[in-house]
Curated annotation (Swiss-Prot):
GO terms of molecular function: ATP binding; pantoate-beta-alanine ligase activity
SUPFAM superfamilies assigned to the protein according to its UniProt record, in alphabetical order: Nucleotidylyl transferase (SSF52374)
A biological process from GO: pantothenate biosynthetic process
Transport among keywords: no
Compartments where found: Cytoplasm
Note: The reaction proceeds by a bi uni uni bi ping pong mechanism.
Known catalytic reactions: (R)-pantoate + beta-alanine + ATP = (R)-pantothenate + AMP + diphosphate + H(+)
The name this protein goes by in its record: Pantothenate synthetase
Amino acid sequence: MRTVSTVAELRAALPREGVGFVPTMGYLHRGHLALVERARRENPFVVVSVFVNPLQFGPGEDYHRYPRDLERDRALLQEAGVDLLFAPGVEEMYPEGFATRVQVEGPLTALWEGAVRPGHFQGVATVVARLFLLVQPQRAYFGEKDYQQLLVVRRMVRDLGFPVEVVGVPTVREEDGLALSSRNVYLSPETRKKAPVLYRALLAMREVAGQGGSVAEALRAGEEALRAVPEFRKDYLAIVHPETLLPLSDWVAGARGIVAGRFPEARLIDNLEVYP
């Protein structure tokens, strides 16, 4: 595996076609490696980027303390069979005078994470667009754990005509259901035991749906599950359309349960298909 940190080195190292791309912010875990494994199976050449993107963090968020360990990441990617690691600095990605932003409009970015974290998806769309232009992948891999982000990237790709297939990969979970996240490292041992409450709320909603209950009944079951852990401060719990993310009052195929909120040490999000 080769590691490069500049745009010039990246361009010199890329093949002309057959690139599968996994953009990350580093501090890799099994969820990231599932993306890499899928990319490795489906593409002759695999590129991974590690870049903690300042544009997607708001004031008071965890940009400066976001976990970083490039040497550990490099070892994991080498073992996973990655061909090229692109690990640029901020100045390389956003040179002095960089003034362009990419904005996906509408409910996809206005609701849920977009409402709680203003400007977040503009930062995501900007960095992903720049990375796509630099790496020129045929396929790019994103985890379903960040489901709203996946839909935003797909919309940007459709609207701007990027010749990239955006592949969603199912969420990887711990044995107790907690979705893997680099931010889980923030959790104290006591909070870690309580963190699967997000997944339990989603399962409760799916169970009600499976028994023929209404959307309203499913939401009540999810809320009840969350109340069992008073330390968790909910930002939102909803059942939404799987493509528009608009809240539902009646079931549709693929309806998605989404949940987010804060523990004292960290903010967590999760989602699950609750109606097949």
